[in-house]
């Protein structure tokens, strides 16, 4: 039996490697660039993350509708003072672009069309100490998020075809990565997160990772702040699988 081109045994073996000594897989992401002198200021008013004060050059954030519901959960990459990349699950790039275009008034910034970009995801047992993991030159490297998750992510932003092909060698099946994602409670757009989701439903660790409560105002902030002031006590949707 095969799962998306891989056998069940290959998927299980890949998943066990991700949990153990380490392995890597490849997923496709949508990437939108925001460039220009006002890029950082504009994103600061649109994203839940404090883009200006990011401790590293990458951070997770919500992009919200004015109602406070989720448009996208994405990762921000700061490439330079006037250049940012927004990385989101494949198929959601246009929703991000359309939402950002909506309030782009008298702002010196340009929002690109989404483009498909490979993301190398390396995972290993969190009890292991790893050094010297190489990534292709031209990658934007970030630490992954999620309870019990250890590894690194490399977004192949400006990578040669040869280096990209080399990075894909010996990759575990994408289904192994998906199993890992679900097992660690990491939400994805279109499944756990939809246009009807409010951020609090994603879980407290996602809020802690993606929302700044000390920055200035941003679109959709009111609902997030109100729920936080009430202890973030919101129902969390679950999915029940029946094998009958």
What role is predicted for each listed range?
Residues 1-244:
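Basic, glycine/lysine-rich polyanion-binding surfaces/domains
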């Amino acid at each position: 039996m095969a799962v998306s081109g891989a056998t069940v045994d290959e998927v299980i073996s890949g998943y066990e490697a991700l949990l153990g000594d380490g392995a890597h897989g490849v997923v496709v992401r949508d990437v939108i660039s925001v460039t220009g002198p006002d890029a950082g200021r504009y994103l600061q008013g649109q994203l839940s993350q404090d883009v200006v004060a990011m401790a590293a050059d990458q951070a997770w954030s919500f992009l919200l509708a004015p109602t406070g519901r989720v448009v996208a959960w994405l990762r921000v990459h700061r490439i330079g003072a006037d250049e940012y990349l927004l990385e989101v699950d494949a198929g959601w790039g246009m929703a991000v672009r359309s939402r950002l275009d909506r309030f782009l008034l008298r702002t010196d910034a340009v929002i690109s069309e989404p483009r498909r970009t490979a993301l190398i995801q390396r995972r290993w047992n969190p009890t292991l100490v790893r050094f010297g993991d190489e990534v292709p030159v031209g990658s934007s490297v970030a630490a992954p998020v999620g309870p019990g998750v250890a590894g690194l992510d490399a977004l192949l932003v400006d990578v040669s075809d040869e280096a990209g092909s080399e990075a894909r060698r010996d990759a575990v099946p994408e289904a192994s990565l998906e199993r890992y994602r679900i097992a660690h409670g990491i939400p994805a757009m279109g499944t756990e997160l939809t246009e009807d989701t409010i951020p609090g439903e994603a879980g407290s660790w996602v809020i802690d990772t993606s929302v700044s409560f000390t920055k200035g105002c941003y679109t959709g902030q009111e609902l997030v702040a109100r729920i936080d002031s009430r202890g973030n006590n919101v129902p969390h949707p679950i999915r029940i699988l029946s094998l009958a």
